[in-house]
Structures are given as C-alpha cells and as structure tokens.
Amino acid sequence: MKYRKREETEIWRNKEIGFIFQNYQLIPTYNVLQNIIMPLLVRGMDHRTAAKECKETIRLLGLEERVTHKPNELSGGQKQRVSIARALSAKPAILLADEPTGALDTASGKEVLKLFAQLNEMGNPIMMITHDLKVAQAAKRVVRIEDGCLTEMEG
C-alpha cells in the first residue's frame, strides 16, 4: 500500500477490512440491529437502507430473533455473531479476526469456527490471529510468528 494521508487510510480501512474483536466491541446502548448497521451509517447510508442491506447477514448468522436485544441480553456466542455480522455489513474485501474465540466457551468457539468456514467457502477471506493451536488448526493456511519473526508456514 502506498503512503496515504491518515484520512485516506481510515477511509480505505473502513471500506476494505471488517474487524472482529476478541471482546466484541459492541455499543452497549445500541440494540443488535443498530450495532450491525453502524458501519453503513458511518458511511452515510440511511437507517432503512442499511437495515435492508444487512437482512441476509442477520439471517445467515441466526440473529433474526435478537435484533431488538441489547448486548447485555446476549450470550458470548451471540455477541460474537453480532460482531461478525457488523464486520460483514460493509462487505469488506477481508475479515480480520483478533482472537475470535478467546472469550467464548468451547461450544461457542466451535460454532464461530464453523461459521468462519462457511463464510470462507462463500468467498470471504479471513485472517485470524490466535494463540490457540486448536483454533489455528481450523485454518487452511497457518503462519506462525514468534518474537516478531516468521518461523513457520503451513498450507
């Protein structure tokens, strides 16, 4: 990527990368739908159009019955699905997932990895950062970095 001004970099990042955070980063006063459509609203899309744009993603992630719930009314797995839906809402070129299963129980973690596999099969590239070797084994390609140095590549 060429050197860009900070504003240009922010616009590019918001358009091209969908971020999935370990601790969800949901806005507690927003309901599920508001959290999911937020990236589209930031881009200037109106609420009704943004909600329509996200309808399929909400269905895909099994959140139809939760759209009016606030984050404190959701399980960890549901919060992570909202985080994933929000990352997908702007149709980014790549998803960047930081420890996406780190705050989840085993069953919810497996559910997220299964969802990532489905999303990847649908053409969504995913770059996942994890310290959990079992989670890394779910990836098609693994790059291992130790002390800032590339030490191993698989796949």
Q: Can you annotate each of these PLM segments?
A:
Residues 1-145:
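ABC family nucleotide-binding domain
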Residues 142-155:
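H-loop (His-switch) and adjacent beta-strand-loop-beta switch element
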